[in-house]
């Protein structure tokens, strides 16, 4: 596809759009990640109740696809091992085959899946100590700001302002020359 424009009204069945078209459109100006400024920003915290955590309300964008959660969601952490510590994670998973984006708890797994059909954002990692009976906020590491596994959704990403800066410098230099000529006279 060399050039593409979207959307256009249908005339005799020549314009059919699907989710991929809309995702491509939104991905052009919304970076994949959690929307920091919406509600609780999908922050993972201890539920202060045994082996339970909760994911706060919030929103995210994954490759142009939107996710919205308007209430806290509770997750029960698996029973701690009596032999060794383990690290679990909470991810937001977009599954194109299932046509869903949902929260998932991954016991003993801190990897993120990213392929043609699945894309995960790791919201938090949870340290489950040997024989633990409660998860505290100190056991939870917020991963939302780590752009290698999650990141923040923004409309801005490395904006190139070189042309504007060059233009400003040229104007400044011209005005400086005009001022110097005026000042000497």
Residues of each region from the PLM?
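N-terminal "first-domain core" detector
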Residues: 1-62
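Beta-strand-rich solenoidal segments
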Residues: 2-12, 51-185
